[in-house]
Amino acid sequence: MNKILGIDPLKKFIFGISAFVLLFWQLNVGAANATALREVDRTVNLNETETVVLSDQQVAKGERIFINTCSTCHNSGRTKSNPNVTLSLVDLEGAEPRRDNILAMVDYLKNPTSYDGELDLSQLHPNTVRADIWSSMRNLNEEDLQNVSGYVLVQAQVRGVAWGGGKTVN
């Protein structure tokens, strides 16, 4: 008798509670919680002698900047224009000067040079010095550059060979 549209009120109530529980669970187990990293994973080189522990927020901000600004050419740590030089720790350590720390990477994002350090790449690689050419870098400040550099270093540590490893790994 109390059926509305052919559905028993008790079934409607149970369905409503189930939907609420599933929705509430999704909100609490979302992507933000999935990106929480251990402190050891967020510890990266600040310079050649010091390390720094990045906050989850710094890594998340760096990820957002990387996706919006860098991922077109550096998807999964690879380098579109030169697959032989990636954003892996091995390649960053092998650069001249080394780019395996936040401050060195920030320097590169301001004044990019070739892997051997000999050639100025300011007209070929996005940077903040030539923001007239590279509009994607125009609004990035020092903190943004540090966050995106930290994100790259964290990914290189956490993902290992999958970061910059190419199609055979990803």
From Swiss-Prot:
Q: Where heme c is bound, by residue?
A: C70, C73, H74, H125
Identify the Gene3D superfamilies for this entry. Cytochrome c-like domain
BP terms from Gene Ontology: photosynthesis, light reaction; respiratory electron transport chain
Signal peptide span: 1-34
* Cellular component GO terms held in the UniProt record: photosystem II; plasma membrane-derived thylakoid membrane
Q: Which UniProt keywords apply?
A: Electron transport, Heme, Iron, Membrane, Metal-binding, Photosynthesis, Photosystem II, Signal, Thylakoid, Transport
Membership in a protein family = Belongs to the cytochrome c family. PsbV subfamily.
Which HAMAP family does this chain map to? PSII_Cyt550 (MF_01378)
The name this protein goes by in its record: Photosystem II extrinsic protein V
Natural source organism:
Picosynechococcus sp. (strain ATCC 27264 / PCC 7002 / PR-6)
